[in-house]
A protein has these predicted regions:
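Class I SAM-dependent methyltransferase Rossmann-like catalytic core
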Residues: 48-72, 76
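Conserved SAM/SAH-binding beta-strand->alpha-helix loop
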Residues: 120
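Conserved SAM-binding loop of SAM-dependent methyltransferases across substrates and taxa
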Residues: 94-109
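N-terminal auxiliary segments of SAM/dcSAM-dependent transferases
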Residues: 1-47
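A short glycine-rich, Lys/Arg-flanked "PGG" loop and its adjoining helix->strand segment in the class I
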Residues: 163-175
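A short acidic, Gly/Pro-enriched loop at the edge of an enzyme's catalytic core
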Residues: 142-153
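Conserved SAM-binding strand-loop segment of SAM-dependent methyltransferases
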Residues: 132-143
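Conserved class I S-adenosyl-L-methionine
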Residues: 84-93
Length: 178
């Protein structure tokens, strides 16, 4: 189970009727496209990749140039995943690696629950179309909205590397795939 935490007070977030709510009543609405914005930032505006960049990357990856690499990442993730796993894709973008990993986990006869985190709302809109089963959050890899020691595996492919945060969220014996 994905254990999200409030970016304001670090309390556990509970999903309720279109929003996430913590014990101190901080509330975060779930967007129509399925993601929740847990990025705390005083400046409004655009964060992460814009629509043009996301489309360009998606179009490039959809042509198959990285298929062998994506398959290798997915196979490695499935190999180290326990039978019931929570996988965090830190910097998930459009969810290409996330979806491949979940498929590989299922093919291996295991069950995985995936949390995708990215700073780009646009990227998460595309990720939600790839698979509505992902839990998706707008957040920074430097401040993951995840409870300590709650993740079996962290994927960090072509995204900011924040080892302290990854160590914080990984369960003892968990894996970082980078």
């Amino acid at each position: 189970m994905v254990n999200l935490r409030c970016p304001v007070c670090a309390g556990a977030l509970e999903k309720r009727a279109g929003a996430y709510l913590c014990p101190k009543n901080h509330s975060f609405d779930i967007a129509k496209s399925g993601y929740v914005n847990l990025l705390l930032n005083s400046s409004q505006g655009h964060h992460g990749d814009d629509k043009l960049m996301v489309r360009a990357r998606r179009d490039f990856l959809d042509k198959g140039y990285y298929d062998r690499f994506i398959a290798a990442v997915a196979d490695a993730a499935a190999e180290f995943t326990p039978p019931e796993a929570t996988v965090l894709d830190a910097g998930c973008g459009e969810g290409i690696y996330s979806l491949a990993v979940l498929r590989a986990i299922e093919k291996a006869g295991k069950h995985g629950e995936l949390l995708g985190v990215d700073i780009s709302k646009t990227a998460l809109q595309y990720a939600s179309k790839r698979s509505p089963d992902f839990t998706l959050c707008v957040a920074s890899c430097a401040h993951l909205p995840v409870e300590d020691g709650s993740v079996d595996e962290v994927l960090n492919i072509f995204s900011p590397f924040v080892p302290e945060e990854f160590a914080r969220v990984l369960k003892r014996g968990g894996y970082l795939l980078r």
